[in-house]
């Protein structure tokens, strides 16, 4: 069943021991959880191996993200909505009625959990590794039942760098959507946003998808203008006399620490001397007003 598969009554749920056997047969490691809880019932569980007989009626069950199994946890509603645009496809997907398809399993070599957060410290999306995640047929603390979107399948195998970048792009789209500029101020804001992304190694196609996805979420009725603004930024040469705007300008135009969050996500813009005015020794002239302006623009 698809679509409505997350909506199931307790009577429809397979016995937890049946699920435990299925997971073990699939080569996945399991852990008993307290009923209607994410809490592991056994102390020292990280060093233990569990079997079907370790589960009691009513227990929840966790799947361990070990042996190359990696979970992507979509925490925010934006990331739940945007995941199909940014994440690789995998057949191993589950969720609950209020957060369908919010857990996606991959095979990769990411050694530890990475959480991507907004400026208010709320988690947007996580790559979870060497941990455990509550899995079907568990009952979430909210009372909702977890269910697979379809058959378990075999998780898609994805290179660690590719999966990490895809998750980072999804988090970036969520940040942009959460702090999308109000009507009347979107032109300069988009130019500065595009410059911020470009200087941090985001490609033009990625930047267009980011702004397009966040713009749809924010009901921007002038998305074609936004796309042109992004493309115009990427059309600039780094040697242009008038450099395109970036994080410094974005800080002035955005709210909620958006520019700072993007800088934390992607890192500071790499230094480059190609557009600076050089002195007689062939190094950037520290007294040049143009150089000072460009340096400030590239700081963010």
Please report, for each region that a protein language model flagged, where it lies by residue.
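Short, mixed-charge aromatic SLiMs
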Residues: 212-227
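Structural motif
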Residues: 18, 57, 180-189, 201-206
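Short, hydrophobic/amphipathic alpha-helical patches that form generic packing surfaces
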Residues: 22, 26, 137, 189-200, ...
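Conserved phosphate/metal-binding and DNA-contacting active-site motifs used
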Residues: 1-174, 221
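N-terminal nucleic-acid engagement/recognition segments and initiation subdomains in replication
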Residues: 2-10, 193-194, 200, 204-210, ...
């Amino acid at each position: 069943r698809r679509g409505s598969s997350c909506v199931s009554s307790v009577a429809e749920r397979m016995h937890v021991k049946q699920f435990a056997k299925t997971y073990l047969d699939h080569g996945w490691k399991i852990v008993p959880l307290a009923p209607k809880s994410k809490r592991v019932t056994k102390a020292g569980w990280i060093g233990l191996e569990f079997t079907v007989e370790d589960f009691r009626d009513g227990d929840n069950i966790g799947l361990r993200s070990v042996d190359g199994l990696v979970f992507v946890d979509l925490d925010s509603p934006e990331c739940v909505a945007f995941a199909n645009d940014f994440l690789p496809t995998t057949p191993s997907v589950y969720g609950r009625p209020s957060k369908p398809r919010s857990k996606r399993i991959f095979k990769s070599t990411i050694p530890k959990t990475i959480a991507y957060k907004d400026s208010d410290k709320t988690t947007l999306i996580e790559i979870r590794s060497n941990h455990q995640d509550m899995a079907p047929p568990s009952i979430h603390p909210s009372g909702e039942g977890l269910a697979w979107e379809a058959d378990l399948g075999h998780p898609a195998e994805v290179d660690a760098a590719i999966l990490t970048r895809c998750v980072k792009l999804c988090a970036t789209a969520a940040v942009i959507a959460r702090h999308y500029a109000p009507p009347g101020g979107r032109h300069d804001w988009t130019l500065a946003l595009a410059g911020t992304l470009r200087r941090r190694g985001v490609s033009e196609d990625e930047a267009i998808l980011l702004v397009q996805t966040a713009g749809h979420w924010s009901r921007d009725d002038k998305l074609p203008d936004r796309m042109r603004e992004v493309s115009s930024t990427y059309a600039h040469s780094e040697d242009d006399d008038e450099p395109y705007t970036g994080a410094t300008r974005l800080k002035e135009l955005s709210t909620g620490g958006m520019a700072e969050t993007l800088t934390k996500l992607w890192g500071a813009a790499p230094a480059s001397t190609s557009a600076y005015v050089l002195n007689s020794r062939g190094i950037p002239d520290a007294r040049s007003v143009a150089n000072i302006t460009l340096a400030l623009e590239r700081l963010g």
